[in-house]
Amino acid sequence: MSKISATKGLTAILSIMTLGAALSVGTGAARAGDNNVTEDQIVRALAPAEKKPLTRGLSVGPQTQTDPAVTAAETKFVQTIRGRNTRSLSITEREEIATIVKDKPKIDLEINFDYNSADISAKSLPSVQALGRALTNADLKGSTFVVAGHTDAAGGEAYNQDLSERRADSIKRYLVDKYGINGSDLVTVGYGKSKLKDPSQPMAEVNRRVQVVNMENKATASK
């Protein structure tokens, strides 16, 4: 009788251990993919207001009615920065971009790079690839997008400014080379540590991000 009880006890323990291991693996896999987004999520976030479906769970920029004159001025400004080198943008132009994008469809992507470099890390490639597919989606293709690099507060201002610009350029090169996106449709800008997403935690990973903004719809971009 004691042998049977011991056997049952051992079987129960092994079952619990196996279940625990399975749960551990499952949880780890879910956590590993937390920061990667899908093509569909990006398309929904960047779609113009008239095409944006009513969904929950994804933060997007506010959609407001603007004065036609303001819209025309913004469009004219966007045309002046299309095709420009990232480092050629003045501080005034960078701030003008930051002002305009506040009311545009946008998404923040937590793109990791190799330490102290602009090389996209392997674990973040799925997000960049999803971005490439999204920007060639029929709902978005042909628009002009801002690709803005941001860093955390570690390091000096000049260092972070340069790093954010190089990382934005790295994303642009990947999208142009791998997905055939017109380079003039991607406006790259770096903000260094000047626009932290979470100022209360300046060193937090959430601040190290690439923000993608849809500056104008296809009808406007094609004019």
Question: What are these language model-derived features?
Answer:
Residues 150-223:
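Periplasmic OmpA-like peptidoglycan-binding domain that tethers envelope proteins to the cell wall
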